[in-house]
UniProtKB/Swiss-Prot annotation:
UniProt family annotation: Belongs to the chorismate synthase family.
Cofactor remark from the record: Reduced FMN (FMNH(2)).
Requisite cofactors: FMNH2
GO molecular function, one term: FMN binding
Gene Ontology annotations for the cellular component aspect, listed alphabetically: cytosol
Gene that produces this protein: aroC
UniProt-annotated binding residues for NADP(+): 39, 45
Source organism per UniProt: Streptococcus pyogenes serotype M6 (strain ATCC BAA-946 / MGAS10394)
Lineage: Bacteria, Bacillati, Bacillota, Bacilli, Lactobacillales
Protein's recorded name: Chorismate synthase
Length: 388
């Protein structure tokens, strides 16, 4: 399985082409639209989300509600493009129109300046448009297809926010996977403690009035993954490493950890390692899950626990100082439409990116020309693991 995305933030559309999806997977536009709608939700989103109502168009690889095994083409139209016809025109236009929305004051923390240097852009909009988080629309769309595969194999997942702009979420003890999932899904903030909703919303409103932004830490949990996915035999076969790369590829993500993560640096080995158990009904298990479901780059059969940290959005309504790329004089950075926070949306993106990596690993590990073939191979493997 592999995919490519294309498109700009204010261009005509966003596109993804996915190759390697088994034939016979039940797939409807509504499956993808559901995930796209989740990405657009959450408290703190800005005006762009009131303009766009993302709906996918499937133009290849699916017939009569089933995948055919051919490449799948997904497209989402940018409604906002109608206001940017001259600025984002494909053909050449008058110089005065080119200057209309030219970006020459790069934003600290964004790809504007370095992108312009790398690709020799006189107008930093050429970097801004593609580096925008709008691109993650298609990564969510691809992830929605991946989640359909995982669902057919009995794998489920959730995300929730652990730290929201410096506020630590108090997680009630002994919540089951399903309880965590339901609480997060029904929260505008993707948190599992409803008692903290108003406190955080008030803080977001305050940050918005200040023209500032906030980030936080998101946790994704995956249930139902058997032991043995990934490999220790080469560095690039380690599944946790693949997940780390994928999570860090999400716009504004600056760190990733598994299980208790960086807290391991403060603990002893006897406190960190997960003791092994075995029962006739369940096979091998662990007393704890400090390592987040991974040993030696392979899954252990425990829930996968992946955490990612998102920096505050770099576009500020009270912009920081920058430099004019023409005169090299100090200037305030360009202001583009932005949000005080996009943490709930980032959680949806992270969840779908993780789903894509896991689906790819499964498709590469098991015979998967068709879904029935994959389901049998996966079921046989589960049975083997249980009786090892």
């Amino acid at each position: 399985m592999r995919y490519l995305t294309a498109g700009e933030s204010h261009g005509l559309s966003l596109t993804a082409i996915i190759e390697g999806i088994p034939a016979g997977l039940t797939l409807h536009p509504a499956d993808i639209d559901h995930e796209l709608q989740r990405r657009q939700g959450g408290y703190g989103r800005g005006a762009r989300m009131s303009i766009e109502t993302d709906r996918v168009q499937i133009s290849s690889g699916v017939r009569h509600g089933k995948t055919t095994g051919a490449p799948i083409t997904l497209t989402v139209i940018n409604k906002d493009h109608q206001k940017w016809l001259d600025v984002m025109a494909v053909g050449d236009i008058e110089e005065t129109l080119k200057l209309k929305r030219r970006v020459k004051h790069p934003r600290p923390g964004h790809a504007d300046l370095v992108g312009g240097i790398k690709y020799h852009f006189n107008d930093l909009r050429d970097a801004l448009e593609r580096s925008s988080a709008r691109e993650t629309t298609m990564r969510v769309a691809v992830g929605a297809v991946a989640k359909r595969i995982l669902a057919e194999l009995g794998i489920d997942m959730l995300h929730h926010i652990l730290i929201f702009g410096g506020i630590t979420i108090t997680i009630p003890s002994k919540l089951s996977f399903r309880e965590l999932q339901e609480r997060a899904l029904h929260s505008e903030l993707s948190i599992v403690n409803p008692k903290q909703e108003e406190e955080i919303k008030t803080y977001i409103d305050k940050i918005k009035k200040e023209g500032d932004t906030i980030g936080g830490i998101i946790e994704t949990i995956v249930q139902g993954v058997p032991a043995g996915l990934g490999s220790y035999v080469q560095w690039d076969k380690k599944l946790d490493a693949k997940l780390a790369q994928a999570v860090l590829s999400i716009n504004a993500f600056k760190g990733v950890e598994f299980g208790v993560g960086f807290d391991m640096g403060f603990q002893k080995g006897s406190q960190v390692m997960d003791e092994i158990t075995w029962t006739p009904t369940q096979g091998y298990g662990r007393q704890t899950n400090h390592l987040g479901g991974f040993e030696g780059g392979m899954t252990t059969g425990q829930p996968l626990v992946v955490k990612g940290v998102m920096k505050p959005i770099p576009t500020l309504y009270k912009p920081l100082m920058s430099v004019d790329i023409d005169s090299h004089e100090p200037y305030k950075a360009t202001v583009e439409r932005s949000d005080p926070t996009a943490l709930p949306a980032a959680g949806v993106i992270m969840e779908n990116v993780v789903a894509t990596v896991l689906a790819k690993e499964i498709l590469e590990t098991f015979s998967s020309t068709t879904m029935s073939e994959l389901q049998k191979a996966f079921s046989d493997y589960r049975a083997y693991v249980k009786q090892f």
